[in-house]
Amino acid sequence: MSHISADDVRKVAKLARLNLPDDKIATYTGQLESILGYVSQLEQVDTTGVPETTRAVEVTNVTRQDGVDPTPVREEILNQAPQREGDFFRVPKILAD
């Protein structure tokens, strides 16, 4: 594992367009070293025979067969309306003239 310097932290912050105050440099230096140490451990894991993937759990779409369902008759639907005007539902007016 390589050592992370304060200049490395400043460079990463600049590349990420982060305004990093000088009093936080030491904190972030330690945190970046810790992260890279963990990545170094992961690099040593033998993954021979493990298929490549982009996620831990596979995502599948739940689908159903398309089918034609009978459509209710318009007159049956309109007859259930509290108020009706011809072939339309009558609803209270909500917009001013």
Curated annotation (Swiss-Prot):
Taxon lineage: Bacteria, Bacillati, Cyanobacteriota, Cyanophyceae, Synechococcales
SUPFAM superfamilies (UniProt xref): Glu-tRNAGln amidotransferase C subunit
Broad EC category: ligase
HAMAP family: GatC (MF_00122)
Organism superkingdom: Bacteria
GO biological process per UniProt: glutaminyl-tRNAGln biosynthesis via transamidation; regulation of translational fidelity; translation
Protein family: Belongs to the GatC family.
Protein biosynthesis as UniProt keyword: yes
Catalyzed chemical reaction(s): L-glutamyl-tRNA(Gln) + L-glutamine + ATP + H2O = L-glutaminyl-tRNA(Gln) + L-glutamate + ADP + phosphate + H(+); L-aspartyl-tRNA(Asn) + L-glutamine + ATP + H2O = L-asparaginyl-tRNA(Asn) + L-glutamate + ADP + phosphate + 2 H(+)
Tagged with keyword Ligase: yes
Protein name (database record): Aspartyl/glutamyl-tRNA(Asn/Gln) amidotransferase subunit C
